[in-house]
């Protein structure tokens, strides 16, 4: 059974829409190189596991304060 990841909910936790796939891809690479997943799942898709870890808060984006510059200031 695939983990259900709601991207809109994930954007509420991490407001950097371009950083989420990069962080998930880096974590998926680590999982592919035999890192232990932080969540229990039957899925073997590394990207799905990485996104689930991000959504549950097991992993986070480093230097998040640098990314605050990327949030648009719309008036």
UniProtKB/Swiss-Prot annotation:
It catalyses: RNA(n) + a ribonucleoside 5'-triphosphate = RNA(n+1) + diphosphate. Gene3D superfamilies: 3.90.940.10. GO terms for biological process: DNA-templated transcription. It comes from the Bacteria. Its EC number is 2.7.7.6. The keyword Transport does not apply. It is an enzyme of class 2 (transferase). Pfam families: RNA_pol_Rpb6 (PF01192). InterPro entries: DNA-dir_RNA_pol_omega (IPR003716), Pol_omega/Rpo6/RPB6 (IPR006110), RPB6/omega-like_sf (IPR036161). Coiled coil: none annotated. GO terms for cellular component: DNA-directed RNA polymerase complex. GO terms for molecular function: DNA binding; DNA-directed RNA polymerase activity. Keywords: DNA-directed RNA polymerase, Nucleotidyltransferase, Transcription, Transferase. Belongs to the RNA polymerase subunit omega family. NCBIfam families: rpoZ. The RNAP catalytic core consists of 2 alpha, 1 beta, 1 beta' and 1 omega subunit. When a sigma factor is associated with the core the holoenzyme is formed, which can initiate transcription. Promotes RNA polymerase assembly. Latches the N- and C-terminal regions of the beta' subunit thereby facilitating its interaction with the beta and alpha subunits. This is DNA-directed RNA polymerase subunit omega. It comes from Thermosipho africanus (strain TCF52B). The gene is rpoZ.
């Amino acid at each position: 059974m695939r983990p259900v990841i709601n991207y809109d909910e994930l954007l509420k936790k991490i407001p950097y829409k371009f950083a989420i796939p990069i962080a998930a891809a880096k974590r998926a690479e680590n999982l592919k190189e035999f890192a232990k997943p932080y969540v229990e799942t039957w899925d073997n898709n590394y990207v799905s596991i990485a996104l689930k870890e991000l959504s549950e808060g097991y992993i986070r984006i480093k230097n998040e304060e640098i990314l605050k510059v990327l949030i648009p200031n719309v008036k």
